[in-house]
């Protein structure tokens, strides 16, 4: 029971309120000084989202995460129930899409695992750029949210499913915490996937997407911090490598260094200008300067701490807006279209499509119309 409570997003207080008991009673159950009734145990198992029998195990079950965990942040812990459920949901969708492609005799995607974490950073970034037809020069013409959408569209056009959500499926009461993870990837050549925690700001999501693409390109998917403070240590760590590739993709040093040499204002003003133009964070700009020794480590971390103090909450767990526009964002537009086309071809049942996309069967037709399918 202690294990089940520890992995639950709520604490003892939440359980006590749901069961209409005092917290001391819950504490006694955990300590073995008392026991819930059969009905209370059933309700407790449902609240904690565990099989009923798990509450009475002497040892916690071994719950392996099905994808590698590359997180390095000091606060990183065992993946929460929310993160585990998101990974399971994404793997279910990825499995359907993989089978869908295999049945059509489609070829594996060549760039998945094309490089290794020992490859040249600039070469990997350039390959991603050319594969996606990613052109940084067009960014000043677009607002930040439009650039993020365009970036996602480019990635999906290349064959990678991109799913963005800030909650577990459609459960708005189960918000995903940026402090726990920013994204993860599945580097399957038949069905590569990137999941981005869109509880984060647009600029942070851009970096996370670029970071996860680096994981795809080296064939090592997993859970990521996508923390811009990781780097500059030359450790050969995968997260550090992917950060450096993301930095070079979004802020190519050859062009950035020239502007740095020609700057007229101060360091902080300059980073703000570049960040606004290219839809990245100011800390991301400063990180590139630190990475290429234009500023030292102390300057970078002083700036980072200063920016942290000034951050207002840019995070949002809202899934509001147009229901039919948000569904392809959560599920990947490419996957959504494939599922709907499969339904039209009588290859996938309406029930299965509804389960995969988290859309009521009665709303699938409207979703088709909104996407121009059929």
Please annotate each region the language model reported:
Residues 1-374:
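Active-site hotspot residues in diverse enzymes, especially metal/ion-binding acidic/histidine motifs
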């Amino acid at each position: 029971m202690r294990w089940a409570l520890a992995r639950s997003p709520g604490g003892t207080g939440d359980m006590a309120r749901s069961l209409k008991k005092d917290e001391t009673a819950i504490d006694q159950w955990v300590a073995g000084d008392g026991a819930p009734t059969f009905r209370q145990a059933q309700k407790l198992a449902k609240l904690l989202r565990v099989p009923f029998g798990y509450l009475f195990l002497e040892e916690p079950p071994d719950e392996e995460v099905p994808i590698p965990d590359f997180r390095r942040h000091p606060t990183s812990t065992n993946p929460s129930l929310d993160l585990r459920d998101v990974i399971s949901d994404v793997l279910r969708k990825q499995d359907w899409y993989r089978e869908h492609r295999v049945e059509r005799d489609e070829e594996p995607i060549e760039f998945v695992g094309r490089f290794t974490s020992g490859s040249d950073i600039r070469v990997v970034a350039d390959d991603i750029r050319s594969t996606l037809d990613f052109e940084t020069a067009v960014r000043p013409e677009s607002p930040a949210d439009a650039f993020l959408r365009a970036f996602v569209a480019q990635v999906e056009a290349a064959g990678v499913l991109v799913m963005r959500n800030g909650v577990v499926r459609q459960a708005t009461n189960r918000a995903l915490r940026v402090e726990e993870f920013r994204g993860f990837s599945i580097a399957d050549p038949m069905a590569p996937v990137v999941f981005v925690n869109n509880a984060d700001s647009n600029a942070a999501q851009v970096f996370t997407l670029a970071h996860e693409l680096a994981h795809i390109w080296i064939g090592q998917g997993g859970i990521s911090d996508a923390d811009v403070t990781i780097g500059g240590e030359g450790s050969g760590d995968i997260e550090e490598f992917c950060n450096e590739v993301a930095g070079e993709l979004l802020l190519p040093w050859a062009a950035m260094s020239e502007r740095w040499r020609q700057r007229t204002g101060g360091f902080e003003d300059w980073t703000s200008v570049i960040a606004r133009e290219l839809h990245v964070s100011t800390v991301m700009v400063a990180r590139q300067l630190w990475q290429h020794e234009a500023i030292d480590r102390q300057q970078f971390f002083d700036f980072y701490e200063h920016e942290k103090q000034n951050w207002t909450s840019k995070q949002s767990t809202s899934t509001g807006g147009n229901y039919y526009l948000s569904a392809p964002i959560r599920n990947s537009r490419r996957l959504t279209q494939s599922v709907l086309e499969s339904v039209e071809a009588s290859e996938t049942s309406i029930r299965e499509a509804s389960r995969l996309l988290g859309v009521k069967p009665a709303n699938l037709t409207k979703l088709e119309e909104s996407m121009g399918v059929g």
